[in-house]
Amino acid sequence: ACFSTAFEIKVAYLGPEGSFSEKAAKKHFGSSTNFVSCGSIREIIDSVEDNSEYYGVLPIENSTEGLVNSTLDEIIESNLKICSEISIPINLSLLSKKNIALRSIKTIFAHSQAFAQSQSWLNKNLSQVTRKDVTSNSQGVLQSKRTNYSASIASIEAAKKYDMKILKRNIQDYKNNKTRFIIVGNHDVSATKEDKTSVSIITKNKSGALSDILEKFKEQKINLTNIQSRPTKKNNWEYM
């Protein structure tokens, strides 16, 4: 781990309060830690880069929807170090400020990942309802709280936090739905002999380039758990 004890740490997470990111942060660091709610992935990274006592908690992968590309892209561009990871169950509930019938709902607020993870239920029960993306599910709860005939998708903890009614529990498409979060910081990471390593590589655009790289991992008997292609954002159709 890379958690320094020389100062009182602060942990930035994707808020507002009641988000799954906050839940992951508290599970990893303990509820007595100083937590800072941020409005975006970029804001979390900026906070950590600008403050040596900060750590950040970022959603990186969902068990059903795959990698969170917005996090991946921001991490690649930063100089932060991945210190640790934690996975938590993601149980999604449909919330509203009042106990209203599903047929009365006109708008649903949620993060794009929440929409994707519950799309089968939504298509079956609320197919005609307008879906509006927000930066986090907790933000969606706040939006719904201010909007009549609306609902949001979030955790039971968020429902309690913001005094929302639970219209339907566990609307996620898969019961064993989990999200993996990474902990990022400025400090070097000590080896534990049970580590994961993330690397970004840009190769020449030639036949066999990927095969050549994979051969090096094979020679060193390194197991690869994931390979992802992302645009370099420097030249069109160029990937790392």
Residue ranges and their predicted role:
Residues 1-240:
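Domain-level signature for soluble enzymes in the chorismate/prephenate branch of the shikimate pathway
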